[in-house]
Amino acid sequence: MRLGLLSVALLFVGSSHLYSDHYSPSGRHRLGPSPEPAASSQQAEAVRKRLRRRREGGAHAEDCGTAPLKDVLQGSRIIGGTEAQAGAWPWVVSLQIKYGRVLVHVCGGTLVRERWVLTAAHCTKDASDPLMWTAVIGTNNIHGRYPHTKKIKIKAIIIHPNFILESYVNDIALFHLKKAVRYNDYIQPICLPFDVFQILDGNTKCFISGWGRTKEEGNATNILQDAEVHYISREMCNSERSYGGIIPNTSFCAGDEDGAFDTCRGDSGGPLMCYLPEYKRFFVMGITSYGHGCGRRGFPGVYIGPSFYQKWLTEHFFHASTQGILTINILRGQILIALCFVILLATT
């Protein structure tokens, strides 16, 4: 009789595992009630904001936007279209496709979570099968071999449902890694600009980085390049002398008016990284999308703003994390149920 009751109890516990924690995203810590005295209304509102940022994957959902080895604002990085130092941009990813036995760089990407890389949707126009892709993370030399560099297969590619290839509207995509990457001094996520009320202007310190061509008719490089750029007003970018009104509200321009610093072919999908002094962190304020040529006067690079896609991005982050938790809990439940049957058989 006792064994029978034990079996029923185990069945109850097993079934409860199917649903427990289902609504708690992976990698987040649920905050219980504080043992401190009742907080003021201002303190309560601050807590609510922090919790909301955690749920939505905001600026401080995890430590992000800092490079352990370098500090760009102290002049330790080479700026101006030259070689980036190792560890300078630990969130920059090389997205590669295998041709024969060789992996070839196709597009850039940005590590925003331990299993998520942000990139441009048009990078996948000729290769939408995730099995074709590999993410190379934690290197400035894509031909080098280093213990801190990781090569991870892609589990899924998620393209924005309203992406239009002809106009590059909604040119945003997510690569879901097959396994979580472990952070180190050379691999760190950048912050997403959610709940960050910062208007970009010409004084905001922003940087581009990638393995693309160093000039319009030149060759790609195996050494990561970087340069400082600045935001260019929508009025100037959409003027008749520039893009003539084709830049949508979800995109913007950055570079410089003379075209001295710009992204080029092979840099697509990589980040526009801006340092926000209020947070003392870097944020991915743009995704490299397209441009008219490379480095042409009056035609700066065009970037997609991730902040316009907060709902779409967070839905995928949350869905993937809860799906993983549910799978684990179902497995636990199945194991416990199997154990119950073993106990029942042993008592008959």
UniProtKB/Swiss-Prot annotation:
Top-level enzyme category: hydrolase
Keyword presence, Membrane: yes
Residues on Extracellular side: 21-324
GO CC terms, sorted: acrosomal vesicle; plasma membrane
SMART domains: Tryp_SPc
CDD domains (alphabetical): Tryp_SPc
Tissue expression profile of the protein: In testis, expressed in spermatocytes and spermatids (at protein level).
Signal peptide from the UniProt entry: 1-20
Protein name per Swiss-Prot or TrEMBL: Transmembrane protease serine 12
Upper taxonomic lineage: Eukaryota, Metazoa, Chordata, Craniata, Vertebrata
